[in-house]
Design a protein with these regions (language model features):
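Compositionally biased terminal segments of proteins
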Residues: 1-169
Length: 169
């Protein structure tokens, strides 16, 4: 992953160290989580949930490690000049319940806590249905939903009808 991200610094490993140092429960969601359950696809975005009461500790530790911290409405972006990889701490409260169902998986060579497959699907459905997101992002979310359903066909029954129809077009 570090080579793909043109990284002088392994920012994902740095994040794992920050999470351990701050004793933060976490799980990966988004495209990287999809890769844990379907054919892996490399992405330069890593979407992570941490317990709500640890967000400040994680961002403080990230700043101490010279990461740039940008706080937005429902996420905190962590970036480094030494890597193209972007870490997004999702702060939308809907995701907090995913933490209790997360499982340990190896993803692209990293041992990670990953949201359950049904939670990953739910997160992708929320993202796809969010009309405020760019169309290109929503199309990627739909492709990720398709990847999950292809790898786990029983998930199709959990999709809203509008998305199920799109998958069968």
């Amino acid at each position: 992953m570090n080579a793909v991200a043109h990284g002088e610094t392994d920012i994902l490993q740095l994040l794992l160290e920050i999470l351990a140092k701050t004793c933060s429960a976490y799980c990966v969601i988004g495209g990287l989580a999809v890769s844990a359950y379907a054919e892996p696809v490399v992405s330069l975005d890593v979407d992570v949930i941490v317990t709500a009461d640890k967000v400040d500790a994680v961002t403080a530790a990230a700043r101490a490690q010279a990461l740039k911290v940008e706080q937005l409405e429902h996420r905190v972006n962590l970036t480094s000049e030494k890597s193209d990889l972007r870490i997004q701490l999702q702060t939308d409260p809907r995701y907090q319940e995913f933490l209790s169902r997360a499982v340990q998986k190896e993803v692209l060579g990293y041992p990670l806590r990953v949201a359950s497959v049904t939670d990953v699907l739910q997160g992708k459905v929320w993202a796809y249905l969010d009309k405020s997101r760019r169309r290109s992002k929503r199309q990627k979310d739909l492709a990720d939903i398709m990847r999950l359903v292809e790898a786990h066909p029983t998930l199709e029954a959990q999709l809203p009808p509008s998305i199920g129809q799109k998958l069968n077009e």
